[in-house]
């Protein structure tokens, strides 16, 4: 950037020289009064040297050279954005007995690889480089704001903005720079969120622990005090608020009372600090979510590549398998056809053997049945013959008996009468004895089963 800044900025006898040592003022004072004799030292930069000049008394002020525009590095958008923000740091009151010493160290600058000196803060308020004392850090910002006020005023019409005296041209340039920086930052964050995350963390941690003061860019002396701006230009509301404050200053809102300026700046800076802390927390969450999403996308891309490789490697194997399957299926079909033919031939032979066996079984059964039938017919014939023989024998016997009776009847009947009478007497006697015995037995049974009669004889 084409910019010329005085060697040192004085405020009531206190200066911020270019050798890296800064002594804060004991009391806070506002500009706008009668100037005091001031001196400046020459500081060498990589591009050349600026001769020391002497500032006069009264209304003689330094004139700021117009900037061409901020040079941004894509690798560190947060550092450039934090360098462009120079507002609201003059209100916090630093204890009067404390001094902040800056020791210059070499560090990398984000714009086009320039190398300058980065001044680190040595103060009890900073613990382990990550828990700074707010009063300490913003006291350094107060000194830097006062140097800005000394270098930013012109002899012509002045505007009072938040306790600072700025010119109309500077105000217009400042608003344009803020808009350009916010637009460029939004584009870079959209295109490269990962690189912006790395640069944000690197710049925020380094500035948070050191409170750096960078000097020198392409041979031009550019002394800046880079404070712990956490929210950066990501919060568009702060940019709009700053532009509105500058526009109100153009309308003529002026405050002449120095004490009221200090109080207003004090509370405004406290609000800015709270807003910056909130915006930093939101920014951290958003960036962390973006990192997680990019990690997931990377994993998905790796999985997709692996799947495509597997598919591409599996395709020739599938083709080979198909060819092998086709050849093997053809040979298998031939083998199966031969097996089917053999099985059909065996089946025909088995059928023929079965038919022969069935015929043999049927013949045996028929022969057996025939033999049984022959036996039955033979028995039948035998029985019929026996029957005929018996009938003939009976008939012959009857004829013989009839002949004998006839012969006995024809004999003498007187001799036979006595025999017949004797036989009839005997038969009658037997029948009579049997009747007597029967009656006696019946009587005995009746007497035995009948109850005995009991006669009552009076005495």
From Swiss-Prot:
Keyword Transmembrane helix annotated: yes
GO biological process: nucleus organization
Region Disordered: start-end pairs: 1-78, 240-266, 308-330
Motif (Nuclear localization signal 1): 60-61
Tissue expression profile of the protein: Expressed in seedlings, roots, stems, leaves, and flowers.
Residues of the KASH domain: 426-459
Motif (Nuclear localization signal 2): 63-64
Biased composition (Basic and acidic residues): 67-78, 251-266
Main location: nucleus
Bias kind Polar residues: ranges: 1-17, 308-319
Bias-annotated ranges (Basic residues): 52-66
GO cellular component: nuclear envelope; nuclear membrane
Coiled coil: 331-375
Compartments, as annotated in UniProt: Nucleus envelope; Nucleus membrane
Motif (Nuclear localization signal 3): 86-87
The organism's place on the tree of life at top rank: Eukaryota
Keywords attached to this entry: Coiled coil, Membrane, Nucleus, Transmembrane, Transmembrane helix
Transmembrane feature ranges: 427-447
Membrane-topology descriptor: Single-pass membrane protein
Domain observations: The KASH domain, which contains a transmembrane domain, mediates the nuclear envelope targeting and is involved in the binding to the SUN proteins.
Subunit text: Component of Ran complexes at least composed of WIT1 or WIT2, RANGAP1 or RANGAP2, and WIP1 or WIP2 or WIP3. Interacts with RANGAP1, WPP1/MAF1, and WPP2/MAF2. Interacts with SUN1 and SUN2. Core component of the LINC complex which is composed of inner nuclear membrane SUN domain-containing proteins coupled to outer nuclear membrane WIP and WIT proteins. The LINC complex also involves nucleoskeletal proteins CRWN/LINC and possibly KAKU4 and the cytoskeletal myosin KAKU1. Interacts with WIT2.
Function noted in UniProt: Mediates and enhances the nuclear envelope docking of RANGAP proteins mediated by WIT1 and WIT2 in the undifferentiated cells of root tips. As component of the SUN-WIP-WIT2-KAKU1 complex, mediates the transfer of cytoplasmic forces to the nuclear envelope (NE), leading to nuclear shape changes.
Protein name: WPP domain-interacting protein 3
Species, as recorded: Arabidopsis thaliana (Mouse-ear cress)
Gene: WIP3
């Amino acid at each position: 950037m084409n910019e010329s800044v005085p060697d040192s900025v004085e405020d009531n006898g206190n200066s911020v020289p270019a050798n890296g040592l800064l002594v804060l003022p004991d009391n806070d004072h506002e500009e706008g009064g009668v100037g005091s004799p001031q001196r400046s030292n020459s500081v060498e930069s990589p591009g050349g040297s600026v001769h020391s000049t002497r500032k006069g008394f009264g209304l003689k002020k330094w004139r700021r050279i117009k900037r061409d525009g901020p040079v941004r590095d894509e690798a560190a958008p947060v550092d450039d954005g934090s360098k462009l923000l120079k507002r609201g740091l003059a209100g916090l009151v630093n204890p009067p007995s404390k001094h902040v010493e800056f020791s210059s160290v070499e560090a990398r600058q984000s714009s086009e690889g320039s190398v300058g000196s980065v001044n680190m803060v040595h103060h009890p308020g900073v613990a382990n480089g990550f828990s700074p004392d707010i009063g300490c850090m913003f006291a350094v910002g107060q000194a830097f704001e006062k140097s800005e006020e000394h270098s930013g005023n012109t002899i012509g019409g002045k505007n009072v903005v938040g306790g600072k005296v700025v010119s109309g041209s500077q105000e217009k340039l400042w608003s344009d720079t803020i808009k350009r920086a916010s637009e460029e930052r939004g584009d870079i964050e959209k295109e490269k969120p990962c690189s912006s995350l790395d640069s944000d963390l690197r710049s925020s941690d380094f500035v948070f622990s050191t409170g750096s003061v960078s000097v020198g860019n392409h041979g031009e002396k550019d002394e800046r005090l880079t404070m712990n701006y956490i929210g950066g230009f990501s919060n568009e509301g702060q940019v709009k608020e700053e532009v509105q404050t500058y526009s109100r200053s153009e309308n003529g809102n002026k405050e002449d009372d120095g004490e009221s300026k200090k109080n207003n700046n004090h509370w405004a800076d406290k609000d800015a600090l709270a807003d910056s802390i909130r915006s930093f927390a939101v920014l951290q969450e958003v960036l962390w979510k973006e990192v997680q999403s990019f990690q997931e996308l990377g994993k998905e891309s790796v999985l997709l590549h692996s799947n495509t490789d597997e598919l591409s490697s599996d395709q020739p194997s599938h083709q080979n398998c198909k060819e092998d399957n086709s050849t093997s299926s053809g040979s298998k079909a031939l083998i199966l056809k031969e097996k089917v033919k053999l099985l059909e031939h065996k089946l025909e032979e088995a059928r023929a053997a079965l038919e022969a066996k069935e015929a043999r079984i049927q013949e045996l059964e028929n022969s057996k049945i025939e033999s049984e039938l022959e036996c039955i017919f033979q028995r039948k014939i035998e029985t019929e013959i026996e029957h005929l023989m018996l009938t003939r024998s009976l008939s012959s016997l009857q004829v013989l008996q009839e002949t004998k009776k006839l012969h006995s009847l024809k004999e003498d009947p007187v001799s036979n009468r006595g025999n017949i009478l004797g036989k009839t007497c005997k038969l009658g006697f037997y029948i009579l004895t049997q009747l007597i015995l029967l009656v006696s037995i019946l009587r005995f049974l009746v007497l035995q089963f009948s109850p005995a009669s009991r006669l009552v004889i009076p005495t």
